[in-house]
Amino acid sequence: MVKDYVCVDIETSGVRVKWDKIIEIGAVKVRDGKAVDTFSELINPGLKLSPYITELTGITDEMLKDKPFIEEVLPRFIEFTGDDVLMGHNI
């Protein structure tokens, strides 16, 4: 059984893979069954969110307007996860 892993939750601007963007990455690093570290970043998708996505996630355009783009966040996330197994739903 895997004892060291990272649980990941990703929020997006929609479900259309070609057009929609990641707006939040959240993760918890687990060591021997215990949470030891967290990662949480809001991401500016460079597009306006639909009212549906705002209602679903609680994330607004105002919250994202001054946040970094994915190109800045992704290297930090990769560093956080390292070589760990990633776990998540529908990722």
Regions found by a protein language model. Name each.
Residues M1-I91:
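Conserved non-catalytic scaffold segment of RNase H-like nuclease domains
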